[in-house]
Amino acid sequence: MDYIAKLTAIAKSHGGIIETRISEQHGISKAMLYNLCKEDKIHRIVKGQYILPDDMQDELLSISKRSDRIIFSHETALFLHGISDRTPFEHTVTAPSGCIPSAAIKSECKVYYIKPELFELGKTTLRTPSGNNVPAYDLERTICDVIRSRNKLG
């Protein structure tokens, strides 16, 4: 059984990222992923996510796959809309109040919180520079968020 061929197909159909749960659905166990990682046949991004050695990591896609309760906002949304030509040093996401993003998300992103009833307002899908779709706020919502948070922006 050629695990690398299976993982290559998984990566190709999921934006270059191999998730543990998806590989298990294809008959590749966590232990096998661990062994392949030790052999340098795949690289671990964060818990539950891997990439092939020759692939470039799409950081935005990786972050968005870690939680369905975050949406790219503020500076990151401006970048995705093409308004800012500078890649943000720290990505910004918005989560509903009461939702606690993982430590991995908090360490890589600035997290803003919003009332749950306003969380989905203005949600759309945008393409990353690598060509993958991620959730982000539309331009109108992004501009409102930037103005509302202008004293907190870095």
Predicted segments, located by residue:
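Short amphipathic alpha-helical interaction segments
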Residues: 25-38
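Nucleic-acid-binding surface
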Residues: 3-6, 13-22, 37, 45, ...
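N-terminal amphipathic/basic helix or basic patch
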Residues: 2-6, 28-31
